[in-house]
Amino acid sequence: MRVDNAIIMAAGTSSRFAPLSYEKHKAMIDVRGEVLIERQIRQLKEACIPEIYVITGYKAEQFEYLRDKYGIKLIHNPDYLIRNNNSSIWAARSILANSYICSADNYFSQNPFEYEVDSPYYAAEYADGPTEEWCMTEDENGFINTVTIGGQNAWYMMGHAFWDRAFSERFLGILEDVYNDPETAGKLWEKIFMAHLDTLKMKIRKYQPGMIFEFDTLNELRTFDDSYKNNTRSVILKKVSADLCIQEQDIVNIQPLKSGNTSASGFEFDSPFGHYQFFYENSTLLRN
């Protein structure tokens, strides 16, 4: 079947990517010389995907230039701070058909997208040994029949998915039924999928290691792009390193500090001189 469009989800705050995600949306981070979301848009266009939609929320204004540069369309998700990514699926409900469902912060070393796709699937890589990722098994027909959070020696969810028109209609029907339930707000769309494997038929698209990357933290990005070890492109981290008279690479183990909702109030980190906290609102640096 021919692909109708691609939905790139870019509404979330990516608080674990502190402090870079406080200064700039994670999708706008430069990775190996390319803006993360621009690389994905180019790969979709190279595959001749006719329509590309970006679902925005946090720092939505940073995506405006993509309209003119690439001819993509933006859809705003007003609930990005109070709901998980099921709200981005809901925001795109009128355009879901034969659709790629993508995350703005994935990096594909090779182009995984195709103009024609046989059936719905979720991209996966294989874990040798234990993993905390979402692991899948398949039945004799190749359809996903179990999904567990954590496992070992298993294929795990990594990257994009493809929904055909029938899958989209079934999923949206289920989502509509549960959307206003309080427990739904915090769920990933994948969690809803897990609860309906009997009716939401999807296969595993298996990729070799080194094909799909995601960066949840600065440390993970530094492993992939070592230029970030001593040049984080972060005004905040440059100020911190100057104030402490250390190199940026000496700022490690960064963790967000939450302020009671989904946004971060600052971050904590380790340095050669001890453990510190930095607060965004007043640019305060405190040693613990």
Predicted regions and their residues:
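A short, N-terminal amphipathic alpha-helix
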Residues: 34-51
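Nucleotide and nucleotide-moiety/phosphate-recognizing core
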Residues: 46, 52, 60-68
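Short, non-transmembrane alpha-helical segments in secretory-pathway proteins
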Residues: 231-251
